[in-house]
């Protein structure tokens, strides 16, 4: 089982590297994917679908995970390839938002936490809106970590959702734990 997981990780890493190289060389390709941000494969335009399958050449992405990976690729293309160097996982970046922006982020993420990935695109639409909100706050979201999270989103243990919440509140918990249990009179 451990070897299978390692092989899967290598395939995902190899696929993401191909995406980064292709999009880094070709702004037109990035634009094709960017225009389809928030879409699933069945509703995406033909150029984006063709480009995705061409880059997935060796079947690095399983058929079961194609929509999730396509979503992550298109979402990553919301940002320029040269911005990817400062990309951070979704909830890690949110910790740096000011209190009003963080409250708006939390509201959006709470909705996502209870939703399963669906073939109709409801989850994708909600997540796409959250990512566009992040972009408006100058936060670059790491597409590779997003892709891995989406692949594991429906796991029975909900470890992705738990990690998102843990990461979101990690810094706040450290700061607010000072004085917990102290008498303030």
Label each region the model flagged:
Residues 1-2, 138:
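Extracellular/secretory pathway and lumenal proteins
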Residues 2-9:
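N-terminal "first-domain core" detector
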Residues 11-74, 78-185:
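Basic, alpha-helical nucleic-acid-binding regions used in initiation and control of genome expression
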